[in-house]
Every structure is written in C-alpha cells, then in structure tokens.
Amino acid sequence: MSGKTIVVLATLDTKGREAQYLREQIEKFGDKALVVDTGVTGAPGTHPDVTREAVAEAGGMPLAKILEHPSREVAAPVMAEGATKIVTRLAAEGKVHGIVAMGGTQGTTLSTKVMRALPYGFPKVMVSTMASGNVAPWVDIRDVTMMFSVTDIMGLNPVMRKILANAAGAVCGMAGVEVTLERREKPLVAITTVGITTQGAMKAAEVLEAAGYETITFHAI
C-alpha cells in the first residue's frame, strides 16, 4: 500500500506467534513491521527488531537486573518506559508511521501508555480483551483505536487470525492516509458542549468563525 513502517508491540514470550502473524499481515499490505519485544521472563517466540534487552535498558534497568527478582511491579514500569522512549524517538525521526499492539489487562496497560505518548493523528490500534468495557483508563484523551479481541489472545485460531488481520489492515490503512494536522493560521477557541447545549454551542461557533476564529468542540462529559 504505502511502504510505511508499523510498530508491532508485544510480549514475545507469550505472544510470539500472534506477533509474527501480525508482521506477515502488515507485509501483505506492502508495509514493513518493526517488532518491539516487551516480554521479560521467557524467550521470544519470534525474532524481534527491538529486543527486550534494549527495551529494558532504555527503561533504566538492565534486563538481567529485572530477572534477579522478576515481578510485574518492577518489570512493567521499566518496559513501558523503555518502549515509550524508543517508539516516540522513532516516530519523531519519521522512521515509524503507526503502531499496533495486542494484550490483556497488563498488555493493554503497557501498550496504551506508549500510544498515549505519541502525537494526535499518529495511527494507534490496540487489540485488547478489555475493549468491550469501559476503555477510558487506557484511551484517556488520546486517539487510540480500541479493537475487541473477542477471544483471549493465546494462540492462533480462525477468530484471532481474522481479528489480527483486520487490525493490520486498519493500522496500515491509517498510515497510508496523507492528511496531516494543519498548521493553525487562525486563533483557536475551544468549546465544550453536551446534548442540551448543542444549539447554543453551534451558534457560538458560528459567531466566532465569522469573527475570524477557528473553533474546536469537546464533549463535556
């Protein structure tokens, strides 16, 4: 499609097969996958482009040190910090153009921390077991696209293959869109609104735009 590079963020000790499948699907679209390993305790189930050792080092603690007394409480913040530093740097340098990840509660928490550090408009797709409920803790105010995994992410099956293929298609499609956030020429005014104030907000926007301002509206709840 677009010849872009897509980050695949995954714990390769538990989701190596799924990450490899995502890589293959992304490559079918003519894009390149850059697999970042955020796993800790087990050997990676597929070859990473960015190793868990590199991620841990970027997070401020060597992997060997984490493995002396492995625990989620220690490992998760380090790997999240390391992955965030690596991916945001690559994005700022224009070397990656989208990110897709998959996980349960822990994987979603780690991966969306990385995603929330990326700019608005940068494609972010999170395949998650948690996406059928309240996703506010993971999305917050960022443009993270949450995709429900339907099944647990534990091996490949007909449903999981289709979901991951859809996720690859989604992130590659987003990365191929050439629309960018425009530089602002007019002063920008924020408006908050909710159902019963919609008409008033629309009138306020009309008046402001006629006066030479640009408006951006946020839902108040």
Language model features: what each stretch is:
Residues 5-11, 66-75, 96-103, 187-194, ...:
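Short glycine-rich or small-residue beta-strand-to-loop segments that form or flank ligand, phosphate
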